[in-house]
Swiss-Prot record:
It comes from Arabidopsis thaliana. It is found in: Plastid, Chloroplast membrane; Plastid, Amyloplast membrane; Plastid, Chloroplast thylakoid membrane. Belongs to the SecY/SEC61-alpha family. This is Preprotein translocase subunit SCY2, chloroplastic. Disruption phenotype: Embryo lethal. Residues 1-34 form a transit peptide. It comes from the Eukaryota. Cannot substitute for SCY1. GO terms for cellular component: amyloplast membrane; chloroplast membrane; chloroplast thylakoid membrane; plastid envelope. Ubiquitous. The gene is SCY2. Involved in protein export. Probably interacts with other proteins to allow the postimport or conservative sorting pathway for inner membrane proteins in plastids. Central subunit of the protein translocation channel SecYE. Consists of two halves formed by TMs 1-5 and 6-10. These two domains form a lateral gate at the front which open onto the bilayer between TMs 2 and 7, and are clamped together by SecE at the back. The channel is closed by both a pore ring composed of hydrophobic SecY resides and a short helix (helix 2A) on the extracellular side of the membrane which forms a plug.
Length: 575
């Protein structure tokens, strides 16, 4: 090859093989180059052909010293042929001429070394920590935006965080109390009517969330009754979603009123355990009642926020989490008792497992049971129902009317309603309330027979199941008109509303009967197991609430999961 056809080779770490004969020559001429071959960062090899023979120019840069060294080698054709054909030869026999680097290369090497030395001596630049924090915050914001972009993840995060906050408030003690003097059963449900919901003994007495959900539940019960009695509220209930929002605001103000009343009663009756009882009674009552009202309204806000921005019903989920928390102590007691004699407890455990399975199956049937009303579409055809990926999964459309649309909310409402007179009797000590407490205690031998309590319990569960604050048939009829659908053999308009009202009343009637029977049977089993096992029992009423809450949570998740595809389908048809 001629000088214009120079070949450039780039080697890393080890440019020349140790077995090659030219390695001995290079180690003799430049020992530092070959004695530490792995420390050489890069080696550039330029080969060219001249009139006298061949020429090699090698440039290498050392990794540690940051210094460039270059030299040139001229060799003849005989050297090339001998080096390629022989495996090893003496360096004295090589026909090699070494051309040392010129002065320009030396000056460039010295200038490079001086510049590297000055660069090493230069002080380190200042690192702006604030900019690092800004970059980190930007990365976190981007990750948060990606995470909360999904409606499912956002609602799941809100539900989990608010449920944790609802439990934290029960362990924040109110200031100004000597808790060594507070008895263990103070402000507990002494009637036994809510003991089947689980044990809450691990919570701190007189905590920030001491009132819990009782103000909201009482306000909801009163408003449900008034919506069927007062003409103005009956008219407001028939206005649809707007009327439902106004009723919710009325429930909030009623909750605030009952929270103030309950907080004043608790603050006044707890004076005997206060450290300010002798010096500042008024100050103690005002401060304690204010904190209790704040805690109760915080619980109300948590319930409403979970229902609107999360999954499921807020009050059911909060009570469900409290029940599961209380089960830890129950399971601990059970394991301590059966650890020594497992064979004696085996029939009892198998019986509990069988009853638990049956109760769970009935709870699923009560929660998921529905009646389907067929529909006909006259505005457009359902050709998209048979396409893959369509949000409409049924070829034949229908309206589902659940036999128990409120889930286990009637059971919760009835349980707390029957426990409220017992709480007032323990606080106020009124003879009338004490008699009511004995009547509403099925385990008492002084009051009425147990069947009285069970009858009252079943009646209220049935009553709360058939109540409907929102006018659902009217909303469904309006929605069907917008969708261009109708019920077969039923005229649109008033006839559709009357037909849907009849169907809703029928399904809720039979669903209320089934739920009241299941809840009453579970309560009877709870009281029986509590009588034969002093110290612990598994509440089957709480199992109903847990199963119902989980199914309602799953139903809510599924609804929000199919919402995007359903919205696209509705926009396609101009709804």
């Amino acid at each position: 090859m001629n000088s214009s056809q120079a070949c450039f080779f780039h080697f890393s770490l080890r440019p020349i093989s140790l077995s090659h004969p030219s390695y001995a020559f290079l180690s003799k001429r430049d020992p530092f180059l070959c004695s530490q071959p792995r420390k050489c960062l890069t080696t550039n090899l330029n080969m060219s052909r001249t009139r006298q023979g061949h020429s090699i120019q090698m440039n290498r840069r050392h990794l540690l010293m940051k210094e460039r060294k270059s030299f040139s080698i001229n060799y003849s054709d005989k050297f090339r042929d001998d080096s390629m054909s022989s495996e090893e030869m003496h360096t004295d026999a090589l026909d090699v001429e070494i051309i040392p680097p010129d002065s320009q290369d030396i000056r460039n090497s010295q200038n490079s070394a001086v510049s590297n030395t000055l660069q090493d001596d230069r002080p380190k630049s200042f690192r702006n920590r604030f900019l690092d924090f800004v970059r980190i915050s930007s990365v976190l914001n981007t990750a948060a935006e990606r995470f909360f972009k999904s409606e499912i993840r956002r609602r799941l995060f809100v539900t989990a965080v608010l449920l944790v906050l609802s439990r934290v408030g029960y362990f924040i003690p109110l200031p100004g109390f000597d808790r060594r003097l507070i008895p263990q059963d103070y402000l507990s449900f002494v009637s036994g009517s809510v003991e089947e919901l689980g044990e809450f003994g691990a919570e701190i007495k007189l905590s920030l969330f001491q009132l819990g959900l009782s103000p909201q539940i009482i306000a909801s019960i009163i408003m449900q009754v008034l919506c069927h009695v007062l003409p103005s509220l009956v008219k407001l209930r028939k206005e649809g979603l707007d009327g439902h929002e106004k009723i919710k605001s009325y429930i909030w103000w009623l909750s605030f009123f009952f929270a103030i009343v309950e907080a004043l009663v608790v603050a006044y009756t707890s004076l005997q355990y206060s450290v300010f009882a002798a010096t500042a009674q008024v100050k103690h009552v005002m401060m304690t009642s204010s904190l209790l009202v704040c805690g109760a309204m915080t619980m109300t806000w948590l319930c409403d926020t979970i229902s609107e921005s999360g999954f499921g019903h807020g009050s059911s989920l909060i009570i469900c989490v409290g029940i599961l928390t209380g089960y830890t102590e129950t399971l601990h007691k059970m394991l301590n008792q059966i650890s020594g004699s497992f064979s004696n407890w085996l029939p009892y455990l198998l019986g509990l497992l069988g009853i638990f399975t049956v109760v769970t199956m009935f709870a699923v049937v009560v929660t998921e049971g529905c009646r389907k009303i067929k529909l006909q579409y006259y505005g457009f055809k359902l050709a998209s129902a048979s396409r893959e990926g369509s949000p409409i999964t049924e070829v034949e459309p229908y309206i589902p009317f659940n036999i128990n649309p409120a889930g286990m909310q009637p059971v919760l409402t009835t349980t707390y309603l029957l426990a409220f007179p017992s709480i007032l009797a323990s606080i106020l000590g009124s003879p009338f309330l004490l008699n009511m407490k004995e009547i509403l205690n099925p385990e008492s031998t002084v009051g009425a027979p147990p069947w009285v309590y069970y009858s009252i319990y079943a009646f209220f569960v049935f009553l709360f199941n058939i109540f409907d604050i929102a006018n659902l048939p009217k909303e469904i009829a309006d929605y069907l008109n917008k969708m261009g659908a109708r019920i077969p053999n039923i005229k649109p308009g008033k006839a559709t509303i009357e037909y849907l009202t009849k169907i809703q009343a029928s399904t809720r009637f039979w669903g209320g009967l089934l739920l009241s029977f299941l809840a009453t049977a579970s309560t009877v089993l709870d009281h029986y197991l509590r009588s034969i096992n002093q110290g612990f029992s598994i509440g089957f009423t709480s199992v109903l609430i847990i199963v119902g809450s989980i199914i309602e949570l799953r139903r809510s998740y599924h609804a929000y999961n199919v919402m995007p595809s359903l919205s696209k389908a509705l926009k396609r048809y101009g709804v």
